[in-house]
Amino acid sequence: MKNIQNLSFFGVCLAFVVIALGAWTRLVDAGLGCPDWPGCYGFVVFPTNEAEIALAESRYPSFPYDINKAIPEVVHRYFAASLGLLAIFLTYFSFKLKEKNNIKWWSLGLLIFICCQGLFGYLTVSLKLLPIIVTLHLFGGFTTLTLFFYIFLRSGNFKSVDVMKIPHLKVISAVAFVALLIQIFLGVWTSTNYASLACADFPTCQGTYIPEMDFKNGFNLYQEVGPNYLYGLLDNPARVAIHYSHRVSAILLTIIFLILMSKLWFSVAAPMASTLGILLLTQITLGIINVVYVLPLYVAIGHNLVAALLLLAVFSVNHLAWKK
């Protein structure tokens, strides 16, 4: 079981790195830094000399080669692929366990899910950053992180905090988890549609609290297949609708989190309330900085990573609340 615990913990750390690399790739507009998959302009890594670059551009004349965009894409791909290799080892050791448990099935499910993530990685490139595909791919990254974390919790002999006596904790923690998933989806949808700066001021949006918004086109999940979606194709009102929804959802999520934290604070689980509070405050601050300072790269990456930490924190509360 120790092997499972170590591998799953390493998986959590590696998945965290992959999420950061994915955010980096997206934020520097390198999603099509390699227009093919799994190679890069037909090379195992990426073209480096003049002859290789000339060959690469002859293969894909519609995609001029830019090494500054190829590097983030290739690095992200190889780190993501290493998650699959790690999941293979995890599944192998899980099936060797003599104890009766279902960790082996969770490990196998994780391996299958990572293979599906690879497929979505291919579709992300082949469909030229189609927003719904990119959104599902990024959401899958958070799911991969959570699955590794769940296996880590199941494999470890951790001292549990008794939260069973906290009234209505199951319901409140479940609502908080679902609300956070919705907020993460809205954040990812904002990013994949290049709507992060649709509202360039705060707390207003384009100088008003009720800007012009187009929800129909902003939340059209079935955008046309074929066009290149790099930099986004939505008009301003549609992007504003996406961005503003993410802001309003953040307010609602904060209220739900405050209720959850109040339940945890007056119990033996007070440290969990403190953790949630610190992460929530950090995330709100990073979100505001992203708008006010026009999406600084490392702040925007941090915004993604704190979202991942919030997900693990709320998942931990649910794990304790629903644990038999």
Give, region by region, the residue ranges found by the protein language model.
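N-terminal membrane topogenic signal
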Residues: 1-10, 324
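N-terminal signal-anchor transmembrane alpha helix
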Residues: 6-38, 179-190
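Small-polar-interrupted transmembrane alpha-helices in polytopic inner-membrane proteins
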Residues: 10-21, 105-124, 175-183, 271-289
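Interfacial helix-loop-helix junctions of multi-pass membrane proteins
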Residues: 25-36, 115-138, 190-201, 239, ...
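Extracytosolic (periplasmic/ER-lumenal) interhelical loops and adjacent juxtamembrane/interface segments
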Residues: 30-72, 196-236
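Membrane-interface loop-to-helix entry segments
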Residues: 71-88, 132-144, 241-259, 300-309
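Membrane-interface helix-loop-helix junctions at transmembrane boundaries of multi-pass membrane enzymes
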Residues: 93-108, 167, 261-276
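A juxtamembrane structural motif centered on a specific transmembrane helix
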Residues: 150-172, 312-324
